[in-house]
């Protein structure tokens, strides 16, 4: 196995570790809301509503990411990206070990902020190294594979988080995450070559005025609101109580709504990344973003679709006679195997449409993401600052990722659960419209196929 291939596999492993930890917290978010029971409070004479506190559960994470982007990206270009990656992975190990001690909204928000720094650093360094090691004509393909590793972790993380939470609570979940992070750290230390590139000065200043990056940013700025709202509120919609506008599903059912998007995205990204290398990346950004917005508008209609189509409220399978009645170990939540096994129970007919729509969201985004990342990597590599180009990409995303959870929390409490998805879908559609207009106006009609 050649040295470059080994390095790609190590970086895929690191993306796996990052994705596993990140999605676990997304999956568990509705249960932290139920467990911590946030309520309005007054700080320095300013009243913070329940909806804003719920929003801070995510905004604490994204705000820390925003603060961390520039120094981490600068450090990656100025010094050894491998060393920076090892440091942020070590921080991640400590952060996930702290989650079991959470006992209030304040402590949860604070630890989520630390998680944001670890996730941002890991993502920036792994993607920068993948883009740097890969050849120009194959970047979207390799980035798609790296993202597929992250989505694979998201699938396992969602299922294991929901299942372990239902059986044991929060504690054991984070032990699993810590072990995976340690394995990733060891693999990075032993198998990833030191990065010898050094960029003097401050590459952000030049890349910030790059015409292609500015054009992409007009779309990405708006699209960040869409994805943050939709991805965050699909599991919240599935898991919170009906009184709060949700469907009140159990942990495993909520996990499946998250897994559906990750699974389809994971399966498609290596293929769509390869296609975008050959047929034009701007076209894939536009098509994927538009499809995502349209699908998001349909998500609140899941209960209506389930009722019209007559979907069942549970999924039951018959157990073979040789297994029925078998005694299970004492540490499992059930004593024995019954003659019928309820795979998914206590859900409404909305469940299957919601899972299907979540899967469609993953397919739509699989067209956009590797193409977008490859475009930023191309510009960064040509101008000598690939970590900084990904840093700009992250910075453009940050306003949406910080403000959208607060907006979503307010909409959920003050307007309706459905309004969160309508606003999210609208942001995606205005984003692709702006992108197309600017692309054609300033770069020509052929740019949609040539980029």
Regions found by a protein language model. Give the residues of each.
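Cytoplasmic helix-loop-helix junction between adjacent transmembrane helices
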Residues: 111-152
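Short amphipathic helix-loop junctions that connect adjacent transmembrane helices
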Residues: 27-51, 232-252
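Central cavity-lining transmembrane alpha-helices of secondary-active solute carriers
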Residues: 55-73, 256-271
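C-terminal membrane-cytosol helix-exit motif in multi-pass small-molecule transporters
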Residues: 179-197, 431-439
């Amino acid at each position: 196995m050649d040295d470059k291939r080994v390095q790609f596999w190590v970086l895929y492993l690191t993306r796996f570790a990052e994705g596993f930890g990140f999605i676990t917290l997304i999956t568990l978010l509705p249960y932290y809301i139920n467990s911590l029971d946030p309520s309005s409070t007054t700080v320095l004479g300013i009243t913070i509503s329940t909806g804003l506190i719920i929003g801070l559960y995510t905004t604490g994470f994204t705000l820390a990411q925003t603060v961390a982007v520039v120094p981490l990206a600068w450090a990656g270009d100025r010094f050894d990206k491998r060393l920076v990656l090892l440091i942020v992975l070590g921080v991640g190990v400590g952060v996930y070990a702290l989650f079991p001690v959470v006992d209030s909204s304040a402590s949860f928000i604070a630890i989520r902020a630390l998680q944001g720094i670890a996730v941002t650093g890991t993502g920036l360094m792994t993607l920068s190294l993948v883009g740097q090691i890969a050849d120009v004509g194959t970047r979207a393909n390799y980035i798609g594979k790296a993202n597929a590793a992250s989505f694979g972790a998201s699938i396992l993380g969602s299922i294991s988080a929901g299942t372990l939470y239902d059986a044991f609570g929060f504690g054991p979940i984070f032990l699993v995450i810590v072990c995976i992070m340690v394995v990733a750290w060891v693999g990075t230390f032993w198998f990833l070559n030191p990065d010898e590139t050094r960029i003097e000065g401050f590459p952000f200043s030049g890349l910030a005025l790059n015409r292609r990056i500015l054009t992409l940013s007009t779309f990405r700025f708006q699209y960040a609101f869409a994805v943050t709202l939709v991805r965050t509120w699909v599991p919240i919609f599935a898991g919170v109580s009906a009184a709060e506008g949700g469907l009140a599903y159990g942990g495993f059912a909520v996990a499946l709504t998250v897994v559906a998007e990750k699974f389809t995205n994971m399966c498609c990204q290596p293929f769509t990344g390869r296609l975008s290398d050959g047929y034009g990346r701007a076209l894939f950004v536009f098509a994927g973003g538009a499809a995502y917005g349209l699908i998001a508008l349909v998500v609140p209609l899941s209960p209506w679709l389930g009722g019209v189509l007559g979907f069942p409220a549970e999924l039951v399978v018959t157990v073979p006679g040789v297994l029925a009645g078998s005694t299970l170990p004492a540490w499992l939540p059930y004593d024995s195997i019954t003659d019928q096994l309820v795979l998914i129970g206590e859900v409404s007919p909305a469940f299957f449409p919601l899972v299907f729509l979540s899967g469609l969201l993953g397919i739509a985004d699989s067209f956009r993401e590797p193409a977008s990342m490859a475009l930023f990597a191309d510009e960064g590599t040509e101008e000598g600052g690939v970590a900084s180009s990904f840093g700009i990409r992250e910075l453009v995303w940050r306003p949406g990722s910080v403000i959208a959870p607060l907006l979503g929390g307010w909409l959920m409490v003050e307007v309706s659960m459905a309004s969160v998805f309508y606003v999210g879908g609208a942001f995606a559609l205005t984003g692709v419209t702006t992108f197309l207009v600017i692309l054609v106006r300033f770069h020509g009609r052929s740019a949609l196929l040539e980029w």
